[in-house]
């Protein structure tokens, strides 16, 4: 699977996955294809060992592409090419903007929305992972201010995420438009 990914992408994502360096792997342009190929490799290992074929699949964001593959909606090469294009567009948008993301744990949705609504700058909810964990996103400075305000307002934990951009925010609008073309 990893060799096929290298061939489709025209670069060694396998070497990056197995040998690093970590700094290269953390770049959006590499992270997304690496996660997808690893997810597909895990799926194929499970299929080979158990013969399991899912009745339905689901995925969120990058995970949608693994779900498309698992459901036989797209073949491997198409999935990898799509995610490579997506990663490139998001990487370009992230380098043009200074964004950040934070996981907020132990605070209600309404309280989080109230706090971030009072912060100057662009900050919004990216993901409702569970009732106990919500991810915020936006301009790095606004997210940093929101982090402090959320701590002061009683969030149990405020965890800045090690990402290279303000994904799932308006900072990615350009990437969304280009990817849809």
What do the predicted segments below correspond to?
Residues 42, 64-65, 89:
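A short acidic, glycine/proline-enriched capping/turn motif at secondary-structure boundaries
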């Amino acid at each position: 699977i990893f060799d096929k990914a290298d061939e489709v992408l025209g670069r060694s994502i396998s070497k990056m996955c197995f040998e690093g360096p970590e700094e290269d792997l953390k770049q959006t342009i590499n992270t997304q294809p690496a996660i997808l190929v690893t997810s597909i490799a895990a799926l194929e290992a499970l299929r080979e060992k158990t013969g399991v074929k899912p009745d339905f699949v689901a995925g969120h964001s990058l995970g949608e592409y693994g779900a498309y593959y698992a459901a036989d909606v797209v073949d491997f090469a198409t999935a990898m090419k799509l995610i490579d294009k997506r990663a490139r567009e998001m990487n370009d948008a992230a380098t043009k903007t200074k964004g950040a993301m934070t996981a907020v744990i132990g605070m209600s949705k309404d309280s989080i929305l109230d706090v971030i609504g009072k912060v100057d700058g662009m900050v919004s909810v990216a993901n409702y992972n569970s009732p106990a964990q919500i991810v915020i996103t936006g301009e790095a400075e606004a997210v940093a201010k929101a982090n402090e305000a959320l701590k002061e307002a009683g969030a149990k934990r405020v965890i800045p995420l090690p990402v290279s951009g303000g994904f799932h925010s308006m900072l990615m609008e350009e990437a969304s438009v280009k990817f849809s073309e």
